[in-house]
C-alpha cells in the first residue's frame, strides 16, 4: 500500500460562539460618537450567516477615509475570508492564514494567526500576509452583515468591506461527498458534443482509508468532460486532488448532474514529456 500524507493548512482550531439572529439582516444600533464609527455597528452577529458565504474584500479605507491600495495588489484575486467548522481562514494572500475567533454582541475577536510558509515573487504579495493579518487579528467591530456583504472596523479605525459569494454548500443545498482524484500531467483531445477541438483532463479516482493509506490499485485514466471548480490545470504537472462532489438538482438536459469543487491539492509531481 502506498501512503500519501494528506496536507492541511496549519490554521488554529477554534470554537465559534454565535448569538442567534431572527433574520438574514443584522439589526443595528445607533452610531458611536467617534469618527471611526460613522456607520452603525451590528447588535448581534449571525454566526450561521458568516459560514454561508466566501467573503471577498471589496473595499478598505483607513481612519481618514483613504483607500488602502496595498491590500489590492491582486486585483483578480481579492483577499477572501471563510468561516467554517470553527475556523477563520484567509486566502489569496501569499500564504494561507488562519486563527481562532469568538463572537460576542457586535464584536468579532480573532486570535493570533498562523500561516503556511512559502515565498511569493509577485510584487506586494508577500506583504499581504502582514497587512491582512495585522488588520484581522484582535477585536473587530462588525458594522453590518447580510447575505450580500460584511463590513468590519479595526481598533485603529480601518474599515474593511467584503462582498458575499455563496459557498458550494449553499449553492448546491447540502454537503458534498468527499472524493480524491488524480489528474494526469497532460490533457488529451476528446469528442465534445458542443465544443470543437476540446481537450479533456485525464483523471482516475484514488481511494484512501481514514488513516491516509491508499486502498486498491489505481485504474486507467479516463476523459473528464466537465470542470473542477477552483482548479487550474498546469500542463506538465500531475496532481492528486481532494474534491467535494455535489449532486445538481434538476440540471438542464445538456448539463452535468454533478459538480466537482476543489478542496485542496494533496500532492503535485512535475512530469517530463
Placement of each model-derived feature along the sequence:
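C-terminal motif of bacterial Sec signal peptides marking the signal peptidase cleavage site
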Residues: 13-16
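Positively charged n-region of N-terminal signal peptides that target proteins for export
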Residues: 1-4
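Lipid interaction determinants
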Residues: 18-234, 238-273
Amino acid at each position: 500500500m502506498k501512503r500519501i500524507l494528506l496536507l492541511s493548512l496549519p490554521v488554529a482550531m477554534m470554537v465559534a460562539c454565535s448569538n442567534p439572529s431572527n433574520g438574514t439582516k443584522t439589526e443595528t444600533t445607533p452610531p458611536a460618537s467617534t469618527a471611526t464609527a460613522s456607520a452603525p455597528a451590528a447588535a448581534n452577529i449571525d454566526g450561521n450567516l458568516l459560514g454561508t458565504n466566501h467573503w471577498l474584500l471589496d473595499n478598505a479605507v483607513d481612519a481618514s477615509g483613504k483607500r488602502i491600495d496595498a491590500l489590492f495588489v491582486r486585483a483578480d484575486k481579492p483577499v477572501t475570508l471563510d468561516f467554517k467548522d470553527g475556523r477563520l481562514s484567509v486566502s489569496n494572500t501569499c500564504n494561507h492564514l488562519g486563527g481562532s475567533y469568538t463572537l460576542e454582541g457586535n464584536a468579532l475577536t480573532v486570535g493570533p494567526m498562523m500561516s503556511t510558509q512559502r515565498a511569493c515573487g509577485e510584487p506586494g504579495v508577500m506583504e499581504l500576509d502582514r497587512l491582512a493579518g495585522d488588520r484581522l487579528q484582535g477585536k473587530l467591530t462588525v458594522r453590518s452583515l447580510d447575505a450580500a456583504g460584511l463590513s468590519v472596523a479595526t481598533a485603529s479605525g480601518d474599515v474593511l468591506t467584503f462582498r458575499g459569494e455563496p459557498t458550494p454548500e449553499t449553492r448546491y443545498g447540502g454537503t458534498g461527498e468527499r472524493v480524491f482524484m488524480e489528474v494526469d500531467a497532460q490533457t488529451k483531445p476528446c469528442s465534445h458534443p458542443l465544443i470543437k477541438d476540446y481537450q479533456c483532463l485525464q483523471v482516475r479516482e484514488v481511494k484512501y482509508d481514514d488513516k491516509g493509506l491508499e486502498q486498491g490499485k489505481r485504474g486507467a485514466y479516463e476523459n473528464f468532460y466537465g470542470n473542477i471548480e477552483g482548479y487550474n490545470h498546469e500542463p506538465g504537472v500531475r496532481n492528486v486532488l481532494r474534491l467535494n462532489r455535489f449532486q445538481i438538482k434538476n440540471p438542464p438536459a445538456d448539463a452535468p448532474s454533478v459538480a466537482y469543487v476543489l478542496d485542496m491539492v494533496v500532492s503535485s509531481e512535475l512530469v517530463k514529456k
